[in-house]
């Protein structure tokens, strides 16, 4: 049997180490439930709350992240900003206004906002009560 070139051995070893690290550190390495009670709450200066659900990598290679947010009525949202990933925003409660590409669109409970990679946008609560929504981030800089 011929000896394998050293670079082949190194590549195979590195792939094995990366796979082992992924399954140990990646919250998406296996099916599971993410308990709402275990998510740490971050509170912003404007009273908005955010809970990170996960950041990980799917078995198919895409980086994915998710967080849940509650934006009180009348709060000033973050300014227009550009993202380096795609997002799906699922409205749970309240009414959100999605400002993008020179237009404003509204979404209520059950509505889904799609934010394409690189879109300059802002999301604000335009309802009378708090707005609750879940953001699913896909690809790009999601791993940060």
Q: What is each residue range found by the language model?
A:
Residues 76-78, 94-99, 141:
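Short beta-strand segments in beta-sandwich/barrel cores
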